[in-house]
Swiss-Prot record:
Pfam families: Ribosomal_S7 (PF00177). Part of the 30S ribosomal subunit. Contacts proteins S9 and S11. HAMAP family: Ribosomal_uS7_B (MF_00480_B). Belongs to the universal ribosomal protein uS7 family. This is Small ribosomal subunit protein uS7. One of its GO terms (cellular component) is small ribosomal subunit. GO terms for biological process: translation. One of its GO terms (molecular function) is structural constituent of ribosome. Keywords: Ribonucleoprotein, Ribosomal protein, RNA-binding, rRNA-binding, tRNA-binding. One of the primary rRNA binding proteins, it binds directly to 16S rRNA where it nucleates assembly of the head domain of the 30S subunit. Is located at the subunit interface close to the decoding center, probably blocks exit of the E-site tRNA. Disulfide bonds: none annotated. It comes from the Bacteria. PANTHER family: RIBOSOMAL PROTEIN S7.
Length: 160
């Protein structure tokens, strides 16, 4: 059953330690089965590990990582005349941060370190220095958008 009105966006409160909404969303993405305290512990412990190991500001490292991984273009599938085309579209800021956090978390969970704290700390530090699996994912997304540039005239925004 369709909605009469668009769903309202939930207001997400900023995290307690750094007063950041982006970090709060990142913690929510780490969270599994409603265990927010555990997710916060993982993120803040990873921040402590970054601070001790690399002697840099962990919050600044996190912001750099998110900024570096955030994509500017992605492809969306558009059906035109019985054929599906991969059309490059711009990514708005909120979706960009959502994709970046998802890619960083997935890349971290696939790393070989034993604990998620170590995995996350390493992946965040690498992403802040434009290295790592999450950066590769962003570059692949941009390459895909660049390869399908010819279909940009099928942009879904123009078709409505």
């Amino acid at each position: 059953m369709s909605r009469r009105h668009a769903a309202e966006k939930r207001v997400i409160l900023p995290d307690m330690k750094y007063n950041s909404i982006v970090l709060s969303r990142f913690i929510n993405n780490i969270m599994k089965e409603g265990k927010k305290a555990l997710a916060e512990k993982i993120v803040y412990s990873a921040f402590n590990k970054i601070e001790k190991k690399y002697r840099v500001d962990p919050y600044q490292t996190f912001n750099n990582a998110m900024h570096n991984v955030k994509p500017h273009l992605e492809v969306t599938s558009v059906r035109v005349g019985g054929a599906n085309y991969q059309v490059p579209t711009h990514v708005d800021e909120r979706r960009g941060y959502a994709l970046a956090s998802r890619w960083i978390i997935n890349a971290a969970s696939k790393r070989s370190e034993k604990m998620m704290i170590d995995k996350l700390a390493e992946e965040l530090f690498e992403a802040s220095n434009n290295r790592g699996v999450a950066i590769k994912k962003k570059e692949d997304t941009h390459k895909m958008a660049e390869a399908n540039k010819a279909f940009s005239h099928f942009s879904p925004k123009k078709m409505k």
